[in-house]
Amino acid sequence: ELDSTAAIQQAVDFGRTYAMVTFFPEGIYTVSGTIKAWSLTRVGGEWENGKINREDFYVPVLVGSAAGASRPVIRLAPGTFPDYDPGDRRFVVEFRNFNPPSNRSFTDENGATRFRYEFPPVRLASTERERFGENTPDHIGPEFRGIDIEIAENNAGASGLRFPTAETSGVGDVEIRFLGDGHVGFQGPPGGGSATLNLTIIGGRIGLDTTNQNDQTGGFPNQGTGAQPTPVLTGLTL
């Protein structure tokens, strides 16, 4: 069975870097790990002439084709995350927004101060985590729509979609289904000014977790507590 993890990750990263949609034609895409739809918080010093001068400050937008008989499916392979651990949620698709580390400044050839930013590794040593605080209130604009997530058997530690975001973002026309045991279907509906539309979750220990902030998943500190204010959900089926 073809493993699409690396190809999807490359496409998501490319789309974010160049402000493009990552488009999924109809089909089944099998993955053997988490698709990391990660972004970095924009900071004022990185704007020039009304444009972002750092490509990494755009956000991922994942959209599935609506032209086929069924939606495209991201399918987690059997036995990818077999061990259940309530303190370590392993998602099929994971949206995160990080505060860039502040110790990467340098002076360019024109004498101007610039910044080098980096994304954190998948797992961080405890001494490194504070440099990559997760910032949900400034997680603005990502989308995940028209794509189903299927979690195959022997994945008791697997969760579906993590989407803790702020305004102008959204999830729509998505079904998350567990074919065996599993953990959380959907965590973190976006806050006010966004929407979660036509979402179906089948199976799992927890269908919907509205914890949008103060989530230590993966060991990253997160600003704020509880959920983003005034989330809008319609067409929700659990």
Feature-to-residue mapping (PLM):
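Extracellular/periplasmic carbohydrate-active domains that bind, remodel
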Residues: 1-238
